[in-house]
Amino acid sequence: VTIKETGEPDTVYTYGEYMRRFVREVKAKGARPILFSLTPRNAWDDKDSTRITRVNKTFGLWARQVAEAENVPFVDLNEITASKFERFGKEKVKTMFYIDRIHTSAFGARVNAESAAEGLRGVKGLELAQYLLPVEIDTKTGSSRKPGRPVVFTIGDSTVKNEDKDDDSMWGWGSVLHELFDTTKVSVENHAMAGRSARTFLDEGRWDKVYNALQPGDYVIMQFGHNDGGDINTG
C-alpha cells in the first residue's frame, strides 16, 4: 500500500501475521507467549438482548487459531468476562466502563484482571498459574441465610458499623439493627465499613461481596455521605 500522508510504499500484514510475529520473537528470546482474546465491549446483540456481543468469529477466533498453530496457550478473556457481564446485567455493566463502550473504569479493569487470572488458572500445565495468589473464597457474606427467609444487608460507613464492642466505644447502628427484627423470619447482616465512601466501598470490592450474595426477596439498606465529600479515593 501507499501511505497517504507520506506517499511512501509500505507492506501491511494481517492481524494474524502480526500476532505470529510477536509469538515467534518472544520464543526466540526464550520467553513464553500467551495469547488472549480482547476484552468485551459494552455491546449487546440488540437493545433488548441479555447477551454480550462476542468476537469469536473475528479477532477472538483469529487469536485462537494463531495460538493453536504456534502451539502456545490461549485464554478466551472475551468469553470469560462477557459471561460475567451477562450475570451482572446492563445497569451494573455500565459502571464497568469509562466514557465509551470500550475503555473500562477501575471496576471494569478489576473484573478483566480477575478474568485473566481465571483463564491462566484454567490452562493445563501452565507454570505461570503457580505464581498467582490463592483465590479468596467469601464464606461470610450471606452465611446467616436460612431456607425460605430473606436477608437484610446493611452497607455504609462508620456510623453503620464501627468498633461495636464496649459500652464506652463508638458504635454503628447497623450492629444493633438485628435487635429490632424477628430473626426467626429474617436474617440481618451488617457489611458496612468505617471510613468508607460510596466510591471506596465499591472500589475495594466490598459491594461485590454483598451483590454476589443477593437473592430475590433480600433487602439492602444503604447509607453513605459522611465520607463522600472528601478526596475522591480516600474515605
What is the meaning of each model-derived region?
Residues 43, 193-198:
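Acidic helix-start/capping segments at beta-turn-to-alpha-helix junctions
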Residues 1-106, 110, 114-125, 206-235:
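Alpha-helical cap/lid subdomain in secreted, periplasmic
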Residues 125-139:
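Short, flexible loop/turn segments with low-complexity composition
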Residues 197-205:
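Structural motif
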Residues 109, 157-159, 196, 226:
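Gly/Ser/Thr-rich helix-start
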Residues 97, 160, 201:
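Short clusters of hydrophobic/aromatic residues that line enzyme substrate/ligand-binding pockets
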Residues 137-192, 209-220:
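Serine-esterase "nucleophile elbow" of acetyl-processing enzymes
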